């Protein structure tokens, strides 16, 4: 759409024009009121899942269930706990992460403990996956099943945190999980009449640096976990993070993936 309108600036102008048109003619019949956060902190917490807010002494807790699918039991525990805490709420991100916000250090620790067994333990487990063909009527492949099998294989192989990126997986060309705009993504496909996944590499969604990833090749579903484990070991041997390694080895991922295509 940006290209059709003449670039990002023209797209922005068109959006602002439509926004002004709507704001000038429609009565939304509601008013959004900004609620001030007045609660005070009760200490300091240092945890990779705790993020300090701009309000002194308050924190947000990162909660990322694998594939964005929380345990119903944990979900209910979190919901019940939220009712008892002043100003606390959940905010959802586009990558299937939930942020439990407006917490004191003590409250943050409570939610960290509550969700400890139902949240990503590594960068790789921060992966995103669409709901997949097991539920979606348009889905070609089961994204959630692939992510679970990959996470289990990576964990079993002892791949260190940071050696693999947070992949995005979509079961069909609809690409709900945006596999084309991240360092590594997969999209449902077919190979030799078998379930398979198209590998995307080097995508980016950062403003001003937007680019669709390269379609590197198609890998059989049964071999995707093996590919990721081999890649993770290769990166780990270098002592670098995946981001550092891929920058230093522009075609490194494709070399590892070549035998799986």
What is each model feature region?
Residues 1-261:
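Peripheral terminal and linker regions in Fe-S/redox and tRNA-modifying enzymes
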């Amino acid at each position: 759409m940006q290209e059709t309108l003449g670039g990002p600036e023209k797209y922005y102008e068109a959006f602002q024009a439509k926004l002004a048109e709507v704001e000038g003619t429609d009565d939304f019949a509601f008013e959004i009121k900004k609620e001030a956060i007045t609660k005070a902190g009760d200490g300091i917490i240092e945890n990779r899942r705790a993020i300090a807010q701009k309000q002194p002494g308050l924190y947000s807790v990162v909660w990322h269930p694998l594939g964005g699918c929380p345990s119903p039991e944990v979900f209910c525990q979190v919901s019940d706990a939220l009712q008892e805490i002043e100003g606390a709420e959940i905010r959802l991100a586009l990558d299937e992460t939930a942020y439990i916000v407006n917490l004191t250090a003590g409250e943050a620790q409570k939610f960290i403990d509550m969700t400890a067994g139902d949240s990503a333990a590594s960068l790789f487990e921060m992966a995103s996956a669409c709901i997949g063909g097991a539920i979606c009527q348009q889905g070609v492949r089961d994204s959630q099943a692939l992510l679970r099998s990959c996470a289990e294989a990576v964990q079993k192989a002892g791949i260190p945190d940071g050696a693999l990126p947070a992949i995005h997986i979509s079961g069909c060309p609809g690409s709900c999980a945006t596999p084309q705009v991240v360092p590594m993504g997969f999209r449902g496909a077919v190979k030799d009449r078998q379930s398979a996944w198209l590998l995307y590499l080097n995508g980016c969604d950062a403003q001003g640096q937007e680019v669709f990833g390269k379609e590197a090749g198609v890998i059989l579903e049964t071999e995707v976990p093996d590919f990721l484990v081999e890649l993770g070991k290769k990166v780990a041997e270098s002592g670098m993070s995946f981001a550092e390694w891929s920058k230093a080895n522009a075609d490194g991922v494709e070399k590892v993936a070549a035998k799986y295509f």
